[in-house]
Amino acid sequence: MSGTGVLLLTLLLLVTMATSDDACSLLNGDDCGPGELCCTPSGDHQGTCETSCW
């Protein structure tokens, strides 16, 4: 069961990364470039790379 969950999570992350260049995930740590922050909506681990979060 846990192997299936890991596989699904990996596929989800790959799809997210492929569809948006500025996407980041707090599950992976900070995927953003130098000087960028991973800005996420409250309660979500997926977000976008921004120079500042509002």
Curated annotation (Swiss-Prot):
Expressed by the venom duct. It is found in: Secreted. One of its GO terms (molecular function) is toxin activity. Disulfide bonds join 24-39, 32-49, 38-53. Residues 1-19 form the signal peptide. It comes from the Eukaryota. Transmembrane segments: none annotated. Probable neurotoxin. This is Conotoxin Cal6.17. It comes from Californiconus californicus.
